Amino acid sequence: GEVIQRPASAVKELMENSIDSGAEKIQLIIKDAGKTLIQVIDDGCGMTEQDARMSFERHATSKINTAVDLFAIKSMGFRGEAMESMAAIAHIELKSKQTKKELGTHIIIQGGKVEKQEDCACANGTSISIKNLFYNVPARRNFLKSDKVETRHIIEQFSRIALANPDISISMFLDDVEHFHLGKSNTRQRIVNITGAKSNQKLVPIKEETTLVNLAGFIGKPEFCKRTRGEQYFFVNNRFIKSTYLHHAVKKAYSGLIPDNYFPSY
């Protein structure tokens, strides 16, 4: 379970798997800040019976076949560690079906062991439920913060993925209440849908293309800067990154426009 530090880590891994599957619609369901249930449902390509079972084996991945593939990775994940890590520390139920198949496969795993696998009737795509996270690692479970803090981490992780993929319809339920319902849109509309309608007037589009890199996105107008960090997102090839170097570069561009102890949004 070393890859999974908290419920938000599992949310990231599962949602990225859905993106890699070519999903156009992803649903995230959370109960008790992810301690009781983390469920992700997508309409992606689904898995074969064998791939579904293999996905829980360590370093088993369908995303690379040869060493050369390592230098041309376009998928979010490729090491094959996360699913195996989750299987070791939670109760897992997976249903997956490929479009051309009449039946899908249904797997139940407990403590890293496959308890059951059978054919099932289910929708195209994949539904995976992570239940009772860290049930067999009490020290790790006790290390988790309050439900409020863990939920905040989950929402932040969800927001990063949603911002990077405006072309995918994504929704999120917290304890049976719909918290986000984001239809397919462009980047600007996705930002507004996540951060609130008032943010639309704050946004300034930027675009730069060079032989080395293409840069596009939005920055916030100086008058809307804040005393606190947050609302700062860098994505490289649709992956969220944290970079002190890049953050300082942006902050330097704002010098003279905002007070030293304030932070711009981007």
Outline where the language-model segments fall.
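N-terminal phosphate-binding caps/lids of nucleotide- and nucleic-acid-binding domains
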Residues: 2-266
